[in-house]
Structure formats: structure tokens, C-alpha cells
Amino acid sequence: MEKGFFTFREYMKKDDCQLTASMEDYLEMIYRLSRDTAFTRIHDLAAALNVQPPSATRMVQKMADIGVVNYEKYGMIILSKKGREIGEALLERHQIIEDFLKLLGISGSVLEETEKIEHTISSHTLDCIADFVQFFKNKPDLIHEFEIYRKTKGKSV
């Protein structure tokens, strides 16, 4: 057995990140919603995340406290420089994982699977997955071979 085994919670504490998984979801969505206009509003954020506006308000206030957004009650939500950088990285992480799952031929809800994975993956593992996905994108013949392999195993592609 590998030395230094920890519970999931302890592994996540080691990352020394102030953002919870929920905060990451909110920050990623704020980034998505504000790419064109440089801001978003609580009602748009709440609708995009399928939460109630008071819940979105509480979370945005917490995020303002740690400096990733600027927000005044009933006003606009504007990402700070730090928030914009993190939001961009979170969206990139999401897209890499989603592309990876699609490449594998995951059936069902790729979005749901992506959400489950993205908050627990290390940056090193994400980098390796990004390289893997890029390698296969550059070799469509291998993707096709993989799809054939999956079909011969009786698995859907």
C-alpha cells in the first residue's frame, strides 16, 4: 500500500485552495456569462446554475470576500483580475475533461460526469489528459480505431 494514504477530504486540503467545489462552479459560470459583457447579474447566474437568487447572492458575497469578484447588492457581478484568471482556468479544465470523456465515447450525461471529475483532479493529471486528448485529436485514424475496438467489445461509442 502506498505510504501517506489520506481520506479524500485530506487530499483536497493539501491543495491549499480557498475555493470550494461550489465556488468553482459559480466562478466558472460567472466567467462564461461575462465573457462578452464583462459582467453578469444575480438573476442570470442563478438561472444558469438552476439555483434560487438568494443562494446565488450568498455565494457571490462569499466570493467577493475572498477577492475573486466585485459585487454590490442588486448590482453587477464583475470578476476581479484574479477571478478572471481562475475562471478562465476553470473553464479550460472543464473543456479538457469534457473532450476527454467524449473521446472515450462516454454515453449518458457527459456534463454530469465532467462536473463530478473536475473538482477532484490534480493539475498534473489534467495536463496529462490534455496531452492525451490533443494527441488523439491530431490522429483521427486512431480515434476511429478506438471506436471500432469499443464496438467489437460490445460497448456503445
Regions of interest found by a model, annotated:
Residues 93-101, 125, 136:
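Alpha-helical linker/hinge and terminal dimerization helices associated
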Residues 84, 98-102, 114-115:
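Amphipathic alpha-helical segments within well-ordered protein domains
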Residues 13-51:
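N-terminal helix-turn-helix DNA-binding core of bacterial DNA-binding proteins
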Residues 118-157:
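C-terminal regulatory/oligomerization modules of transcriptional regulators
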Residues 42-77, 81:
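Canonical helix-turn-helix DNA-binding module
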Residues 1-19, 157:
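N-terminal leader segment of winged-helix/HTH proteins
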Residues 75-94:
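Basic, amphipathic "hinge/linker" alpha-helix immediately C-terminal to the N-terminal HTH DNA-binding motif
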